[in-house]
Amino acid sequence: GEGRMLAYRIDEEVSLRMFDEGDAEEFYNLTIHSKEHLRKWLVWLDQIESLEDITQYIRTRLKIMAEDGGYLKSFAIIYKGKIAGTIGFNAFNKGNKSGVVGYWIGENFQGKGIMSRALKAVIDYGFKELGLNRIEVCVATENEKSRALPERFGFTEEGILRQAEWLYDHYVDHIVYGLLREEWE
């Protein structure tokens, strides 16, 4: 691979690819249908009011990619031809060769092992194609579903960031999980 990963087939059901503006409507519907289910943990989802908001979100992602030499940082997760969620590097530090992975999946797509497959592919991509040495996942301490993923892939629980995020009316602590390239290979 040349590190650009515009589309990546994981298996017969799941693939990752870049967003394009033509995805706006489908992606918007996914966020609307998943709002109740995800809003507890994703404040930005609650702020999406219109198709225009999603189009803007996609444009921003594409702009970040273009500015960064075409390396993809955020992916649409495709399950049987439909957008199921997103995964990608929310933060990226070239000097230290580290990246922070974030992800979410629509309510109807839960419990099919989709996110496990996607995360495994993104970890591979991060270490092999982007040349990262360290990958982090930060999860609210009470978000047990989300915590199960890094734990399954051998991430080390490295510490707690106290009151790391403001969720509507209260702060939540984040657990920082870390995985090093030498632990993955």
Give names to the regions the model predicted:
Residues 39-60:
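Conserved GNAT-fold acetyl-CoA-binding loop/helix
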Residues 38, 49-50, 65, 184:
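A short hydrophobic/aromatic micro-motif that marks alpha-helical segments and, especially, helix-coil
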Residues 65-70, 155:
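Short loop/turn motifs at secondary-structure junctions and domain boundaries
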Residues 1-26, 30-37, 74-185:
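Acyl-donor (CoA/ACP) binding surface of acyl/acetyltransferases
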